[in-house]
């Protein structure tokens, strides 16, 4: 077939690239580029003088390696009206950077541009060529690709979701080929507008099903919606009120407290509402200027079992109260219920969605991600004294913190649906009480008050605006840490690792146990001998086949520290506070394991927490993002909880390690043992924590592969993977620290093409 194609190919055009914007050469060759902004662009110029741009059906081939946050390539086409997103084509790529894609370029195309990514990062473009092909070749190439994917993905859920089948290949080849492109790693994610249209717009049949489901509710609590009306835009207030009237669940009341300084138009509107509907309660305040006072007055009028605090500018989805009451019926004793949220503009266009995780205490201590979408048990709010004026501007966060303090984790519930639409920042009158430095200071004081019963805890500005860093104390004298490092012929990497421990670590009370697993190279053997002469280093010999779990369990038996630090020999500390930061969290009684922020040698993220379910198994959050990138909703720069962290740098108390029986050396000798350990730590009732304030380099290769190079390794890898699937059901697990609306195909927190929607009416 490949010999046949050249005879029917018309021509191939090879292109060179010229930077247009946000690009600079990063090396001595013309292949390596640095993206300096969010929209890097190359002009594509034919290498041969006089060549015209290919058109019609073409075959695009390239090799383009990228590191950054949003790695979707797009080809822009100018047919005479200039370049625009409307005339552009997504060019999918494999994880390795290979591009082989059939597209159709209009006949009147004059120029081409390439956007390699949509973020800062690095790009290596080895070559790019476009070949005009005949209709026959197009069909054969499409069939060849689809058939290959049918065989490769035949037993996967992804192939089923996209309907990649033999039958579809025969009846809808073009559609099947386009969907096969979505199976490639760097393909275009679902945009939020499409998500809203496909998955977040209720059809009449679904509304009918919701009504039938509500008729079966054992609990039908009255929900009191509180709106403090201060300095209001009457049009936005009307939108907020209308969103309450539009609720599918009808057992609600609306309690509004009106600032005395709001104008007569607002007073007249609300007065007429209350006269027309007994569910509307309006309190007119004699004083003005305090959102806390208005909120308390609205709370005083509430008769509901639960209260919803609705900002005067915000909008509820029509099913918001239904989802809340569905959760109340699913679980007893809920105190706090919160949801996902997005932003809405004056035209009703929604954007900037934030899909929250389930209850994530340490993320909540890093940023207020739930109070504006929260529902509370009314009796608890009243028992706590309602809203406190001394935290004006941060009163909602203060209330949420006090409710959290009086609740256990099972009483805090997340609904993975977009139930709140916040007024888009920058819209007229959209500023709310949580914005601004005064609000941040009020929230910081509220957070400090939350920790006031824990001596030594301090709260300061986080790495991102509007966020917080909570520091936990280390007692004096500091507990001893045992750093455990397995190695086999680690050589220069081990030297770099040890040098950083001794010369770039501010924590003083530690010992190092290096486990030599049959090193043979003279450089490593000599270095280990020199290490053994240090008073706080022990070199242990492990003369058995490599078993990561067994090696670490063996070393732990020789440890004398209260704290264990499991460290790979290819890891290097970047800044001196890394171990102190990790130990300070590991000493917290509710924290069972602590992970660090690991960067590849070139500074891009290797590990920022482990998300279960990605790729049907697990993967590292924000992998390949720039080190300083905030990540999704700031999560690459915030202390938070994850289901697991990597064992390449993992700190935990020794008593926790014993409580979960250490690493599983029988079933997981090489792979997945760190994930399994963390999942057992969580199963034992502890939280796993990741901190961005402990930064180390991990010199693991980008192209490490899947550990299946030989038949023996392949068989062992499959045994370990199957064991994890059996023990933890990782292919079915909804990671509580992720969100089921987000993709399981990549590590970039983009929206899933087929989200696992929370639809309680279907249960």
Where are these regions (language model features)?
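Cell-envelope/extracellular polymer assembly enzymes that use nucleotide-activated donors
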Residues: 221-226, 253, 398, 479-484, ...
């Amino acid at each position: 077939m490949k010999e046949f194609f050249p005879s029917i190919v018309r021509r191939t055009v090879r292109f060179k690239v010229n930077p247009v914007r946000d690009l600079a050469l990063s090396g001595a060759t013309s292949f390596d580029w640095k993206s300096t902004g969010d929209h890097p662009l190359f002009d594509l110029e034919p290498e041969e003088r006089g060549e015209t741009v290919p058109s019609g059906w073409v075959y695009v081939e390239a090799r383009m390696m990228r590191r950054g946050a949003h790695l979707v390539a797009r080809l822009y086409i100018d047919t005479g009206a200039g370049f625009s997103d409307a005339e552009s084509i997504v060019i999918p790529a494999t994880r390795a950077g290979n591009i082989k894609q059939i597209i159709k370029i209009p006949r009147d195309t004059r120029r081409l541009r390439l956007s390699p990514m949509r973020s800062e990062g690095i790009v290596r473009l080895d070559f790019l060529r476009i070949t005009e092909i005949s209709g026959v070749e197009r069909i054969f190439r499409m069939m060849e690709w689809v058939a290959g994917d049918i065989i490769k993905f035949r037993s996967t859920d992804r192939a089923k979701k996209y309907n990649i089948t033999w039958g579809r290949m025969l009846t809808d080849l073009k559609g099947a080929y386009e969907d096969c492109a979505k199976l490639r790693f760097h393909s275009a994610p679902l945009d939020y507008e499409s998500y809203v249209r496909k998955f977040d717009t209720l059809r009449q049949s679904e509304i009918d099903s919701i009504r039938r489901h509500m008729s079966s509710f054992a609990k039908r609590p009255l929900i009191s919606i509180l709106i403090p009306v201060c300095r209001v835009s009457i049009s936005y207030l009307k939108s907020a009120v209308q969103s309450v009237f539009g609720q599918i669940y009808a057992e609600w009341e609306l309690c509004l407290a009106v600032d005395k300084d709001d104008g007569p138009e607002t007073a007249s509107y609300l007065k007429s509402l209350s006269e027309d509907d007994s569910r509307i309660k309006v309190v007119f305040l004699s004083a003005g200027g305090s959102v806390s006072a208005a909120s308390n007055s609205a709370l005083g009028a509430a008769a509901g079992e639960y209260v919803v605090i609705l900002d005067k500018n915000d909008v509820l989805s029509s099913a918001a109260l239904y989802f809340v009451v569905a959760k109340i019926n699913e679980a007893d004793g809920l105190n706090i219920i919160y949801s996902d949220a997005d932003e809405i503009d004056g035209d009703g266009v929604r954007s900037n969605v934030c899909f929250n995780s389930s209850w994530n205490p340490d993320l909540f201590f890093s940023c207020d991600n739930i109070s504006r979408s929260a529902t509370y048990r009314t009796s608890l709010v009243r028992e706590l004294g309602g809203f406190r004026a001394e935290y004006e501007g941060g009163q909602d966060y203060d209330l949420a913190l006090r409710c959290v303090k009086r609740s256990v984790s099972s009483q805090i519930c997340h609904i993975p649906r977009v139930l709140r639409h916040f007024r888009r920042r920058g819209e007229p009158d959209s500023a709310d009480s949580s914005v601004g430095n005064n609000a941040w200071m009020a929230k910081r004081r509220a957070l400090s008050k939350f920790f006031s019963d824990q001596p030594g805890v301090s709260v300061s500005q986080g790495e991102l605006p509007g966020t917080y860093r909570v520091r936990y104390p280390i007692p004096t004298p500091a507990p001893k840490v045992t750093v455990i490092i397995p190695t086999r012929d680690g050589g220069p990497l081990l030297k770099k690792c040890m040098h950083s421990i001794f010369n770039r670590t501010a924590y003083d009370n530690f010992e190092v146990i290096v486990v030599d697993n049959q090193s043979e190279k003279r450089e490593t053997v000599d270095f280990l001998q020199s290490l053994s002469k240090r008073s706080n280093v022990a070199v242990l010999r492990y003369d058995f086949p490599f078993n990561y779990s067994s090696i670490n369990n063996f070393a732990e038996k020789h440890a004398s520290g209260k704290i264990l630090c499991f460290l790979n020999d290819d890891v290097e500390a970047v800044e001196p506070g890394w171990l102190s930061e990790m130990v300070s969290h590991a000493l917290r009684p509710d924290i069972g394991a602590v992970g660090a922020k690991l960067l590849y040698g070139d500074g891009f993220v290797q590990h920022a927490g482990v998300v279960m379910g990605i790729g049907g198994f697990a993967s590292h959050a924000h992998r390949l993002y720039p080190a300083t990138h905030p990540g999704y909703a700031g999560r690459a720069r915030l202390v938070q909880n994850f289901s697991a962290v990597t064992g390449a740098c993992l700190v935990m108390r020794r008593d926790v390690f014993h409580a979960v029986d250490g690493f599983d050396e029988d079933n997981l000798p090489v792979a997945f043992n760190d994930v399994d350990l963390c999942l057992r730590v969580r199963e034992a009732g502890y939280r796993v924590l990741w901190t961005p304030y402990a930064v180390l380099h991990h010199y693991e290769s980008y192209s490490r592969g899947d550990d299946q190079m030989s038949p023996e390794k392949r068989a062992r890898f499959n045994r370990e993977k199957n064991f994890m699937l059996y023990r933890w059901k990782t292919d079915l697990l909804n990671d509580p620290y992720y969100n089921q609306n987000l993709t399981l195909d990549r590590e970039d927190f983009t929206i899933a093409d087929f989200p696992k929607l929370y639809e309680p009416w279907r249960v």
